[in-house]
């Protein structure tokens, strides 16, 4: 079990990598994201307390209305795809292509499901 993923040496090495290499990267990313969110919250609180409160509210209304209009535009009635029944696989596609050309006739089980003309 020397090269197995369950071997003690492999597990120990992965644990060291997680602790010493990957975890600091995750911690730095978390700090960056929290700082970014903190800045956004501070900006929102400053703008709401300033004279531009009406402008901020109008911009929020515009954004929310544009999101609603985008969502309405996204709701397109598309025909539903049936998830039941046989699927085409590469073998069937190949058989259809080559049987149509008449180059090769295969007598196999899956060819009986092909539509015959």
From Swiss-Prot:
Transmembrane segments: none annotated. Residues 107-117 have a biased composition (Low complexity). GO terms for biological process: assembly of large subunit precursor of preribosome. The keyword RNA-binding does not apply. Pfam families: YBL028C_N. Residues 93-106 have a biased composition (Basic residues). The keyword rRNA-binding does not apply. InterPro entries: DUF2423 (IPR019434). Keywords: Nucleus. Residues 39-117 are annotated as: Disordered. It is found in: Nucleus, Nucleolus. One of its GO terms (cellular component) is nucleolus. Signal peptide: none annotated. Belongs to the UPF0642 family. This is UPF0642 protein C32H8.05. It comes from Schizosaccharomyces pombe (strain 972 / ATCC 24843).
């Amino acid at each position: 079990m020397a090269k197995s993923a369950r071997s003690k040496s492999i597990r120990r090495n992965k644990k060291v990598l997680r602790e010493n290499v990957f975890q600091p990267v995750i911690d730095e990313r978390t700090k960056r994201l929290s700082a970014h969110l903190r800045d956004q919250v501070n900006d929102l609180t400053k703008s709401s307390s300033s004279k531009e409160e009406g402008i901020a509210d109008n911009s929020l209304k515009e954004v929310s209305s544009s999101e609603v209009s985008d969502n309405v535009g996204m709701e397109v009635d598309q025909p539903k795809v049936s998830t039941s029944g046989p699927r085409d696989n590469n073998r069937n596609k190949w058989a259809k292509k080559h049987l149509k050309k008449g180059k090769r006739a295969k007598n196999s089980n899956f060819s009986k499901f092909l539509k015959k003309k």
